[in-house]
Design a protein with these regions (language model features):
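Cysteine endopeptidase catalytic domains of the caspase/legumain-like
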Residues: 1-240
């Protein structure tokens, strides 16, 4: 039996109770789960998660992650930055004018995951965030545009759907993928391409799809080469 490529966590939040709904996120999450399973990842997944359920799922993932040399997190849904920190927005989020109360009671900090990655530099740690959608209706006095830059710790690559402090584009059609996830799905299965080169191709595709309005961005401190799809020439020839 072929060894597992790694462990992936896929979270897709689309059906928000109070914020703008994100129709493409459900398909984005489902399609990413399928392609990661095809690439031989074990996948833990959840969709339309409330805050408590998000923390529970992340905790489950981190407990199992100790057993894998490669871990990947893919999140699609609303994401926000507050005072230089990035947060996932659960579907039951209720806006509060107080930053402290809002962050402590309504959001899920991505540092719940990035702290684990930083503490495990011997792993290949990958975080992919298709979460820089338009402001979900929060006051700009509290919430900034898009997500803020995150410095990847040793052994980590963090990929954003668009540049820091910018918003990403997506269709309102639930049968379509976002520009970023569409490009990611098209490129992640390409055989024998290093992860950094794969994300360059994703960036070029998104720039074309968005007429230059959206430019994906990565921050990487990976310390070893990583390929999502390693195939022999015979295996490639069989698919042609």
């Amino acid at each position: 039996m072929k060894a597992k490529k790694g462990l992936a966590l896929v979270i897709a939040n689309a059906d928000y109770l109070q914020q703008n709904k994100l129709p493409t996120c459900k398909k984005d999450g489902n399609d990413m789960q399928k392609v990661l399973e095809y690439l031989n990842f074990d996948v833990i997944s959840g969709s339309d998660l409330k805050r408590t359920s998000m923390y529970d799922l992340i905790s489950k993932f981190l407990e199992v992650a100790e057993l894998y040399s490669t871990i990947l997190v893919y999140y699609t849904g609303h994401g926000v930055q507050i005072d230089g920190e990035n947060y996932f927005v659960p579907i039951d989020c209720e806006y509060k004018n107080s930053k402290a109360i809002f962050t402590e009671t309504q959001l899920v900090g991505i540092n719940a995951i990035t702290d684990f990655m930083t503490a495990n530099p011997s792993k290949t740690n990958i975080m992919i965030l298709d979460a820089c959608r338009s402001n979900p209706g929060f006051s700009k006095d509290v919430v900034g545009d898009g997500l803020t830059e995150v410095m990847a710790g040793n052994g980590t690559l963090i990929a954003f759907a668009t540049a820091p402090n910018k918003v990403a584009l997506a269709s309102q059609n639930e049968d379509e993928n976002s520009f970023y996830t569409k490009a990611l799905l098209d490129n992640i299965v390409r055989p024998n391409i290093k992860i950094e080169d794969m994300f360059k191709s994703v960036r070029n595709d998104v720039v074309l799809l968005s007429d230059g309005e959206q430019v994906p961005w990565e921050n990487t401190s990976l310390n070893k080469d990583f390929y999502f799809n390693t195939m022999s020439q015979d295996e490639i020839d069989e698919q042609i």
